[in-house]
Amino acid sequence: MYTTTLNKIRLHNPCTGGWAKLLKTLGKTQADDDPVPLSLILQSNGLEDAIWTLQCLEGADREIRLFAVDCARQVQHIMTDQRSVEVLEVAERFANGQATSKELGTSRAAAQAAAWAAAWDTADAAADAAWDAAWDAARVKQAEIFLKYFGE
């Protein structure tokens, strides 16, 4: 189980609403160094705030990268360019110490080029509609994945 503290969160300038919500959930009025489970932040504030809080963790780079890869794999079936799939494989290998930062950078650049190429080919209206539907479905699954890596 991963935890952070209110003091660590405060150092990263959280949004006012999310901060107030978390303090209220914890029954506190100010920051302290008591451990706060990330799963509680997910439950209290939702996935976006829980993901934002990952920047407050130390020593969780591997899990954060694997979480990102796992979330991206949820939409891998709609990736039409092999470079996008390959960057997931390299990122996962990198997280597990099986790829170099140079390999990761090269595959990331290739995937970004693929993303730009795809973006120019997509009509804005269709993209917006698809994004909204996919976003809603993906957020539910991503909350489950978040708990897999950072829950109790």
PLM regions with names:
Residues 1-152:
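Short, glycine-biased loop/turn motifs at secondary-structure junctions and
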